[in-house]
Amino acid sequence: MNEQSEKNNSIQERHTDHSFPEKNCQIGQKQLQQIERQLKCLAFRNPGPQVADFNPETRQQKKKARMSKMNEYFSTKYKIMRKYDKSGRLICNDADLCDCLEKNCLGCFYPCPKCNSNKCGPECRCNRRWVYDAIVTESGEVISTLPFNVPD
């Protein structure tokens, strides 16, 4: 009985082997036709003058020109000048002013983690772009003001 079932299985396998390539061929042709149709739909039929005259080199040149104009505009109008130099001294008069705004103060803050100066407040003075105008309490009382005129 096992021999008969093996023969039947082998006959069925042979039969399916013959019909299977034909089905594969039909499926493959249908898929190719679908792909060709989709590609035709995606192709430009009338791209217009902007796409037809497209040149990547001139586009890149125009982009560079626009970027340089934009950078020039922003660099001159909105450039914030530094108030302190690299060692933490005021650039306008080379004064070594403490952030407490007292002229004769030798430094009343903890040492700065960046420059080790006792004259830096919560933020290091080296290359800083702003100055303290005044020291004011929560009640609004002014304790000290900037002793120098610092230009913008």
UniProtKB/Swiss-Prot annotation:
Region (Disordered): 1-21
Alphabetical list of PANTHER family matching this protein: ADP RIBOSYLATION FACTOR LIKE GTPASE 14 EFFECTOR PROTEIN LIKE (PTHR46804), ARL14 EFFECTOR PROTEIN-LIKE (PTHR46804:SF4)
Protein name: ARL14 effector protein-like
Source organism of the structure: Homo sapiens
